[in-house]
Amino acid sequence: MAAVFMVMLGRGKTFLPSALIGKPVPTFSLPALSGKAGLSDADLKTGKPTIVNFFASWCPDCHVEHPYLVQLSKDPGLAAKGVRLVGVAQKDKDENTRRMLGAGGDPYAAVGMDANGRVSIDFGVYGIPETFLIGGDGVILAKHVGAMSPTVFAQKFAPLIAKATGGS
């Protein structure tokens, strides 16, 4: 048992497996960031994969990953497959979130405001940023803890998106 713990500990914070992988997203409905669409579990059951990024304006690693998320949101290959990127602002204020997205670009098709962190808890989020890949049927396919990067996306998310959309 101690050996298993040490192996898991050595994998770092980005490896904590989620008990929700392979299960439907929790039921939720979040109010919208002003000027955007709100977000609910129904929005994640569109028949196409959705990338859900939990972030906050006060999170340093969220600012680190932000330029890559903006780049990802403009990827013509993902757009052709109908993949959307949506955000959940965790325990943040509307004006701070708008300021962050205004300064760095807005990669999100929709942003839900999780003011009390309840939806984040329901998703098993324990530290932001965290990013989930949701299948078109609303089933959680993958989770990444920490800043999203081209390497992580290519290794962890891209193959699952290809499989979910029947392409390469």
Task: Please state what every model-predicted region is.
Residues 28-51:
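A short beta-strand-turn-helix
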Residues 47-50, 55-58, 127:
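Short pre-active-site segment immediately N-terminal to redox-active cysteine/selenocysteine motifs
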Residues 33-35, 87, 107-111:
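Extracytoplasmic/periplasmic mature domains of Sec-exported, cell-envelope-associated bacterial proteins
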Residues 63-105, 115-121:
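Structural microenvironment flanking redox-active thiols in thiol-disulfide oxidoreductases
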Residues 1-31, 168:
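N-terminal targeting signals for export/organelle localization
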Residues 48, 100-107, 113-165:
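Thiol/disulfide oxidoreductase modules built on the thioredoxin-like
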Residues 27, 82, 108-109:
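A generic structural signal for alpha->beta connector loops
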